[in-house]
């Protein structure tokens, strides 16, 4: 017999329910840490001989935008932030003319800018005017921020192709040169992941700065939002359920 925790999409065997209850209680104690380092690697992958590239996109709320790129193979880290405006040091409640954006750090040996553009187009409605979904306002506009002439060429070509797909409506996506990308406040980083405290426990209750830079947290952020490609979503499901079945190992920090 299995009981589905629909909100979190995991299945806990009936025999582990008592354990799960005490585990939930332990979540209140920040000294408790549950790690799955043997299950999912969080190896640092950027180094001088393996440099990462970055790209910045705006496609609505940065909570969901960050999650949309998190599970893509070759994407190492993501950060929610603000770009495209003139205001210095924007904040969530006072961002001026900036757009909520996501900075994507990726390994160019695994994924290219063209593939990131494909994710961008497939993850939002580029024809919606003055907002995205239920979020209305200029801060939720669709925009590609380019870092080079080559990125500008690829972005422009992809926009033309997107427009040809539907001639009955106009693609509203802007393309502009990236100025300064301002990282958003900590509360907005890995937002989807933070809605699932037990996933935070699984990776060891990282401090905020570590969580923001974690490749593992980046993947789990996409997973928590159910935005991973089906194969990856299923793979992480099985890993998490395996840990649950075995009885999560609890390590207490001293």
UniProtKB/Swiss-Prot annotation:
Enzyme class: oxidoreductase
Organism superkingdom: Eukaryota
GO function term, MF aspect, one: L-methionine:thioredoxin-disulfide S-oxidoreductase activity
EC number: 1.8.4.11
Record carries keyword Lipid metabolism: no
Stretch forming the signal peptide: 1-33
InterPro entries, alphabetized: Met_Sox_Rdtase_MsrA_dom, Met_Sox_Rdtase_MsrA_sf, MsrA_MetSO_reductase
Reaction equation(s) it catalyzes: L-methionyl-[protein] + [thioredoxin]-disulfide + H2O = L-methionyl-(S)-S-oxide-[protein] + [thioredoxin]-dithiol; [thioredoxin]-disulfide + L-methionine + H2O = L-methionine (S)-S-oxide + [thioredoxin]-dithiol
Family in the record: Belongs to the MsrA Met sulfoxide reductase family.
Function per UniProt: Catalyzes the reduction of methionine sulfoxide (MetSO) to methionine in proteins. Plays a protective role against oxidative stress by restoring activity to proteins that have been inactivated by methionine oxidation. MSRA family specifically reduces the MetSO S-enantiomer.
Protein name: Peptide methionine sulfoxide reductase A5
Organism: Arabidopsis thaliana (Mouse-ear cress)
Name of encoding gene: MSRA5
């Amino acid at each position: 017999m299995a009981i589905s925790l629909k909100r979190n999409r995991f299945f806990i065997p009936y025999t582990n329910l008592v354990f799960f209850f005490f585990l939930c209680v332990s979540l209140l104690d920040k000294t408790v840490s549950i790690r799955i380092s043997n299950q999912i690697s969080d190896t640092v992958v950027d180094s001088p001989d393996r440099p990462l590239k970055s790209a910045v996109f705006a496609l609505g709320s940065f909570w969901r935008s960050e999650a949309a790129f998190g599970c893509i193979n070759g994407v190492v880290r993501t950060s929610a932030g603000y770009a495209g405006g003139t205001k210095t040091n924007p904040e969530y409640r006072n961002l001026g003319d900036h757009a909520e954006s996501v900075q994507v750090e990726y390994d160019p040996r695994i994924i290219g800018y063209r593939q990131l553009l494909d994710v961008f187009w497939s993850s939002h409605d580029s024809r919606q005017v003055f907002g995205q979904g239920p979020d209305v306002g200029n801060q939720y506009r669709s925009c590609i921020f380019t870092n080079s002439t080559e990125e500008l060429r690829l972005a422009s070509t992809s926009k033309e192709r997107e427009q040809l797909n539907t001639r009955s409506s106009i693609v509203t996506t802007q393309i502009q040169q990236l100025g300064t990308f301002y990282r958003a406040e900590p509360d907005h980083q890995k937002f989807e992941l933070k809605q699932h405290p037990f996933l935070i426990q699984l990776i060891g209750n990282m401090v905020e700065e570590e969580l923001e830079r974690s490749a593992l947290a980046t993947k789990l952020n996409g997973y928590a939002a159910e935005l991973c490609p089906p194969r990856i979503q299923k793979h992480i499901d099985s890993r998490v359920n395996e840990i649950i079945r075995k009885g999560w190992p609890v390590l207490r920090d001293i």
